[in-house]
């Protein structure tokens, strides 16, 4: 038996021991115009997230290093991960987080040496991965407790208060932490518990950003937009097709509509899609006889939402989000490959192109501007979306339809036009044009869903 030396109620005032790192990641903040994120030095931060929900519980130290190395190499800078998925879960080393599944009773042992099995506990493993991520330039967006536990009545208000305070204090000095309150949760249910968790994190980790990860086809702004603890909004556009969406909003796959809604709210807060359809998961989520979402789909979600005004985007893959590996007894959602194979999925490799495109131009001045499009914007897969700064504009088409542009929206008497390929990241010059009137641009190739293009317009000075 391990020596249990603490419970949350006794640990609230105890700070964990961490190695000092002379090259700490800068903390994150909301930009001055409240539309975007930046680091504490004022540099742009484009959120490019990956979904690694079960990183802490399913991967050992070497596997975690492999995963984080890969995501850093592919340009991701945020990993979304759950601290407590189920209250009785154990990690890959057989360690449980809690005493008796009670969220207010931590199972913490003396020491943290990996060579000593009695010392290295569940929380030490998380500490180790947090530091691994920081060393690779990665931020971890932590869900304190998955929403199903709260829905099922396994967490009461006092337990939530104790746990959230302890957890926030434990990681308060780690610069690479972001908080995702909720966790596939409806904020109008158990609202008092979600408010308590948000307030405790804000009180005890005041330098960390906080948002709320909501239930599918809903958004944090529906319940918490005015909460003092909520720094930016997040929505989950979810995993359903147009014909599968039976919600009141009925936005289906049009995730740009969530951004449009949040963009109009006061006070101004950044927003992003924190869970679109995952690559490699059945359409509708639960029935593996349905078609599976692919790289074309996740690109569409990414460009639609970011060009509509989003401050970033979170990608996900079915196998990676659940860290599916050989020997898993209950793999979920029709998963067809192991996480190690899915690391190189096409969509995961293509996400960096969006990040590079956005960061190639002045970041904080960018706005959505549909008035650039002189023709019909289109519906569903025909929808075109435009964004611009003072001397540049991007217009996205998912299927290569002609783009008719109302010129004169950016500075300069002349503009240079080019095609940016979201599948490869390559740019092809079209030519120079007078910056007035309207002009039609015909993308390369046929009109086919998934043959997507970004029209890039730049002022010639």
Region roles according to the model:
Residues 1-22:
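Bacterial Sec-dependent N-terminal signal peptides
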Residues 19-74, 389-391, 405-406, 410-430, ...:
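Non-catalytic accessory regions flanking glycosidase/transglycosidase catalytic cores in CAZymes
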Residues 267-271, 278-282, 294-431, 444-461:
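Aromatic- and carboxylate-lined catalytic core of secreted/periplasmic carbohydrate-active enzymes
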